[in-house]
């Protein structure tokens, strides 16, 4: 498997502001299907699974989950069987209508659909015991992929070439990626996380995995109403940004985060000559699924 792990930093020139420097770390280019933070989160988990003799990976996710797609692709690439426990039993007959689930299935993942009520019990020991009875031995990956080994992988996102940046900006889902960045950032750097969903619970989740509470904060103003929710302003921004920079953005995570960073620059949040590193966490597979939903609503599509 070929991975692109070098020379990922791409400077971006802003048409409206020459006093703040933006560089995007193109983690989306690491691999066509196992890209961005998903590669980072899976790396050491795969090593552990292999060392412990597991042949099967089991994980959880929703209908358009980047983690489900990446885990399926990982299994295909590395010879693991994969099982995806999918939220929403109504999706059982709609696999081919859903680009993410169709990709996962074609990549060899066995999909088990459960009700949303049962999905809430996914971390309960009785439920995991039932899964072990059904599927025998498996290596468990949590929803979103965040655990201690995932944090270890995300700590490798920043390299020695990144120490000259003042701010590091990243989208936040389960909190694993930002935790890795917080742990590896230099003392003079500030990490800004942009949650893709509503709720202040993420702060405590992130604290579980971090060594410092001083060098980071969450910007909760750019979730666009919650997880998976977008509007025409965000679509316009994503499409315009791609035209101007040739960098595609996903609408769930990186698109929202970059919209927020640009808005903050316009409102003078950052001082002159500030150097900002933006982490592109991939997730581009989700564009196709989002466009299906946008088309149903008669809204503009993401290019």
Question: Where do the model's predicted regions map?
Answer:
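PLP-dependent amino-acid enzyme catalytic core
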Residues: 1-303
């Amino acid at each position: 498997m070929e991975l692109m792990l070098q020379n990922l930093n791409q400077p971006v020139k802003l048409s409206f502001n020459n006093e703040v420097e933006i560089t995007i770390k193109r983690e989306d280019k690491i691999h066509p299907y196992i890209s961005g933070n998903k590669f980072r989160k899976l790396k050491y988990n795969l090593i552990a699974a292999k060392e412990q003799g597991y042949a099967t990976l089991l994980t959880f996710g929703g209908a358009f989950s980047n983690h489900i797609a990446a885990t399926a692709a990982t299994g295909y690439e590395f010879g693991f069987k994969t099982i995806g426990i999918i939220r929403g039993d109504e999706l059982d007959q709609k696999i081919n209508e859903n680009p993410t689930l169709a990709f996962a299935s074609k990549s060899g993942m066995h999909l088990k659909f459960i009700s949303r009520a049962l999905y809430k019990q996914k971390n309960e020991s009785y439920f995991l015991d039932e899964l072990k009875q059904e599927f025998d031995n498996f290596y468990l990956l949590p929803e979103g992929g965040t655990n201690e080994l995932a944090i270890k992988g995300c700590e490798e996102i920043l390299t020695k070439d990144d120490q000259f940046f003042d701010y590091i900006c990243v989208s936040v889902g389960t909190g694993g990626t930002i935790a890795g960045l917080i742990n590896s950032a230099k003392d003079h750097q500030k990490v800004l996380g942009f949650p893709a969903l509503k709720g202040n619970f993420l702060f405590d989740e992130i604290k579980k995995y971090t060594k410092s509470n001083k060098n980071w904060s969450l910007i909760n103003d750019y979730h666009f109403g919650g997880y998976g929710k977008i509007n025409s302003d965000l679509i316009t921004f994503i499409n315009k940004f791609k035209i101007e920079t040739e960098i595609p953005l996903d609408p769930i995570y990186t698109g929202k985060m970059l919209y927020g960073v640009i808005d903050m620059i316009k409102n003078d949040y950052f001082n002159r000559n500030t150097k900002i590193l933006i982490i592109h966490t991939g997730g581009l597979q989700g564009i196709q699924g989002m466009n299906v939903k946008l088309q149903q609503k008669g809204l503009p599509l993401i290019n």
